[in-house]
């Protein structure tokens, strides 16, 4: 019990270091990189920690630094900056992956879980050429987007919403109603290929 409490305390401290950073600029959204300390051993970061690649074998767990922030069971990585307020927009190049999840998660979500499996993460998932929403391991289909080269995510913290955006049409495809109770971070999972993030963007006009 004491060990579990200590782990939770360390995770909270890790998250607290990043609180408030995302809302310092009124016009631009959260600017982030991927946090290597959270990345599962099957994942490798690239392009100055803005992209992530999946490796079937990955690194030997013994060669990866042990820390409480790292995901141990699932190929997940979190961003390094938390959101506690405001409207934020970022994009993800998805053309090189056929199976992935993108969204947001509580900064202290369990590192033994996967985004979309628990009830403290909210994601859009792409698998078998179809899109779904995913929360607490429950999936619902999302229609009308196909597989574009790039998609956008619009986070509206106070409104408790996360939307998938069609970048080419600058329009919302689907909106997830969320239940934020504290700081959240952009979150990513993949099982093939690579994802590339683009953050620090203005919310497009009309969204």
UniProtKB/Swiss-Prot annotation:
Top-rank lineage group of the source organism: Eukaryota
Q: Name one GO cellular component term.
A: mitochondrion
Q: What is this protein called?
A: SPRY domain-containing protein 4
Entry keyword annotation includes Acetylation: yes
Q: Which residues carry this modification: N6-succinyllysine?
A: 139
- Specify the B30.2/SPRY domain's residue ranges: 12-206
Q: Which UniProt keywords apply?
A: Acetylation
Q: Name one Pfam family in it.
A: SPRY
Q: Which residues carry this modification: N6-acetyllysine?
A: 53, 130
């Amino acid at each position: 019990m004491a060990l579990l409490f200590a782990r939770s305390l360390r995770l909270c401290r890790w998250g607290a270091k990043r609180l408030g950073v995302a809302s310092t600029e009124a016009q631009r959204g959260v600017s982030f990189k991927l946090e290597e300390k959270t990345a599962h051993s099957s994942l490798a970061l690239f392009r100055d920690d803005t992209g992530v690649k999946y490796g079937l074998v990955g690194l030997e767990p013994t060669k990866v630094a042990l820390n409480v922030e790292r995901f141990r069971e699932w190929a997940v990585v979190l961003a390094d900056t938390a959101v506690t307020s405001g409207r934020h927009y970022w994009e993800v190049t998805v053309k090189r992956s056929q199976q992935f999840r993108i969204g947001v998660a509580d900064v202290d979500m369990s590192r033994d879980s996967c985004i979309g499996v628990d009830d403290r993460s909210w994601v859009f998932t792409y698998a078998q050429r179809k899109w779904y929403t995913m929360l607490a391991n429950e999936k619902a289909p999302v229609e009308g987007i196909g597989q574009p080269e790039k998609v956008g995510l619009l986070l509206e913290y106070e409104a408790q919403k996360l939307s998938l955006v069609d970048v080419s049409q600058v329009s919302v495809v689907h909106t997830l109603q969320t239940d934020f109770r504290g700081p959240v971070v952009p979150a990513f999972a993949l099982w093939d290929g690579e994802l590339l993030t683009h953050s620090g963007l203005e919310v497009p006009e009309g969204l």
